[in-house]
From Swiss-Prot:
Substrate binds at D24, F25, N26, R40, H63, F64, G65, R66, R121, R154. The gene is pgk. It catalyses: (2R)-3-phosphoglycerate + ATP = (2R)-3-phospho-glyceroyl phosphate + ADP. GO terms for cellular component: cytosol. HAMAP family: Phosphoglyc_kinase. This is Phosphoglycerate kinase. Its EC number is 2.7.2.3. Belongs to the phosphoglycerate kinase family. The lineage of its organism: Bacteria, Bacillati, Cyanobacteriota, Cyanophyceae, Acaryochloridales. Its main location: cytoplasm. Keywords: ATP-binding, Cytoplasm, Glycolysis, Kinase, Nucleotide-binding, Transferase.
Length: 400
């Protein structure tokens, strides 16, 4: 499923062309509207700079937050200001993303100019993938580049609908890197291939666990979902989080792992607390000895060691989801130890892929983000790609 990339378009293909680039500028801001993490803006720079250098007229489009109609707090003005500083050139922020004023501005652009359209989610037609809205959005451009992997699993006007009206439609550098790492890890991995799946609920990771059992050599499970597996085995889990309606499923997944010859590892010890708080009393216990009124909030030190030993000979490791409640420092040790160990494995030539969401926050918190092979920018999108699903935003691009 390899897709055509912006790298394959030359200056001759792009010079003087108006290029609509779907980026992901959905950055976190504080109550004053100041950007607190500009990672997503920086991640889009290689594609934007490449288009500028090839003489294109760059028209950026993104969503920001979840507005219901126009919301003054969710205008993209601060993003345009920061982008302008990073690019060392002016970035015009337009007042809308469709309409005559937008078309007039984009037609008057010089080669190498950059503008940012207003928050595309101010229009309900974006999330509905309304063909009429998609047509109006595409009217300002000729070529389409999608560099927003984080929204590739959504069939929206700016990720899928506009491709009906623009050509060529290609992947940006960020999108290309995501596809290269995630698809290779699943389709042509260097083995042994291990996946570490964490998070609190089995229900949100069923699809990915089922799909991974078809592909991996080892599956390590941590996070709150382990207690559903323990309860299914008949163990007492105290007040730990359990999805009662998923007990049969947990049994099925363990059986499936055996049938497929996949080594499925669950923690052997856990850190339990007497309540859900950072300052709770805690102790390390074996999974057979969880006290009645206590709840498990992290994997224990023996499990960390066991997980590290299991990963030692692996050549590819995919990690999605924390090992415990890592927002509380007291219960972050399991997650942090795994993050550090993966950084160590990367330095020994192992391909390590951090698949979106909380695991990205975890490796950033530990300060080892730059030591991983690849950090996925899309939470839901990377999960769906690992599940083997077709993502609308990727399917809509031209094949290589």
């Amino acid at each position: 499923m390899s897709k055509k990339s912006v790298a394959q378009l030359s200056a001759a293909d792009l010079e003087g062309k108006r290029v609509l680039v779907r980026v992901d500028f959905n950055v976190p801001v504080d109550e004053k509207g100041v950007i607190t993490d500009e990672t997503r803006i920086r991640a889009a720079l290689p594609t934007i700079q490449d288009l500028i250098s090839k003489g294109a007229k760059v028209i950026l489009v993104s969503h920001f937050g979840r507005p219901k109609g126009v919301d003054e707090k969710l205008r993209l003005t601060p993003v345009a200001q920061r982008l302008s500083e990073l690019l060392h050139k002016p970035v015009a922020k337009l007042d809308d993303c469709i309409g005559d004023a937008v078309i007039a501005h984009t037609q008057a652009m010089a080669n190498g100019d950059v503008c940012l359209l207003e928050n595309v989610r101010f229009h309900p037609g974006e999330e509905k993938n309304d063909p009429e809205f998609a047509k109006q959005l595409a009217a300002c451009a000729e070529v389409y580049v999608n560099d927003a992997f984080g929204t590739a699993h959504r069939a929206h006007a700016s990720t899928a609908g506009v491709t009906q009206y623009l050509s060529p439609c290609v992947a940006g550098f960020l999108m290309e890197k995501e596809l290269e790492y995630l698809q290779n890890a699943i389709e042509h991995p260097r083995r042994p291939l291990a996946a570490i799946v964490g998070g609190s609920k089995v229900s949100s990771k069923i699809g990915v666990i089922e799909a991974l059992l078809e592909k991996v050599d080892k599956l390590l499970i941590g996070g709150g979902m382990i207690f559903t597996f323990y309860k299914a085995r008949g163990l007492n889990v105290g007040k730990s989080l359990v999805e009662e309606d998923k007990l049969e499923l947990a049994k099925h997944l363990e059986t499936k792992a055996q049938e497929k010859g996949v080594e499925l590892l669950l923690p052997t010890d856990v850190v339990v607390a007497d309540n859900f708080a950072n300052d709770a009393n805690s102790q390390v216990v074996s999974i057979e000895a969880i006290p009645d009124d206590w709840m498990g909030l992290d994997i224990g030190p023996a499990s960390v060691k066991r997980f590290q030993e299991a990963l030692q000979d692996c050549k590819t490791v995919i990690w999605n989801g924390p090992m415990g409640v890592f927002e509380f420092d007291q219960f972050a040790k399991g997650t942090e130890a795994i993050a550090r160990y993966l950084a160590e494995l990367t330095s020994q030539g192992v391909c390590t892929i951090i698949g979106g969401g909380d695991s990205v926050a975890a490796v950033e918190k530990v300060g080892v983000a730059d030591r991983m092979s690849h950090i996925s920018t899309g939470g839901g999108a990377s999960l769906e790609l690992l599940e083997g699903k077709q993502l609308p935003g990727i399917a809509a691009l031209d094949d290589a």
